[in-house]
């Protein structure tokens, strides 16, 4: 190579800001999402439908937000510890006892409104595998697994909006998920976003969670475990 050409290329490279040459360091991640959730409150009742199903119906939307700090990160992925919270609310009508024509009794919906609200809080450990998405942009998928200790803070309101019951139930959860790397759509814009804001990557994620939230098997607590599994999707930023 001509010496003058080599010097010109080297000078141009040195003139670039460091942020344009090297991706910013990895601190952690932030995510926001939502998914269907149905607590297994009726599990203790032999008859169907149980009180929850009669009063509040089936599943509802639970919204979640979380942030994690990477304690170990390399080319394969990262291990993160973090915190998540969210909100769930389901409205319904209370039940009253009705006497049937044959003399038997049954519970039927009344005109009194009621609601169950839950604020879940989670202490999480997440293992992320980003190597495929980082190395092969034609396979822009990242995978992750998460374990968490859970506390679901809940309350029930009456027709006037006052709390009639409240409490907290502890437990655990496990999650497995996949995330689609949106950087692959426009790598140039992704680099600009990293340079300007420090956001390394943007993902759309989808995951499956099983939560066992029953005070570790206590018969005295409400069972707020997921009925089967819950599905969630959302947006995740890695920075």
Regions found by a protein language model. Name each.
Residues 21-27, 70-79, 130-141, 183-202:
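Short loop/turn motifs that connect adjacent beta-strands in outer-membrane beta-barrel proteins
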Residues 32-34, 63-69, 83, 121-129, ...:
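Residues on the lipid-exposed face of transmembrane beta-strands in outer-membrane beta-barrel proteins
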Residues 20-72, 215-225, 232-238:
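Short glycine/proline- and aromatic-enriched beta-strand/turn motifs that initiate or cap beta-hairpins
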Residues 26, 57-63, 115-121, 141, ...:
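Residues that define the transmembrane beta-barrel architecture of outer-membrane proteins
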Residues 46-55, 106-115, 157-167, 218-222:
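Extracellular loop and loop/strand-boundary signature of outer-membrane beta-barrel proteins
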Residues 66-159:
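Gram-negative (and chloroplast) outer-membrane scaffold detector with strong preference
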Residues 23-25, 179-239:
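Predominantly the C-terminal beta-signal and adjacent terminal strand-loop region
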Residues 1-25:
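Cleavable N-terminal export/targeting peptides
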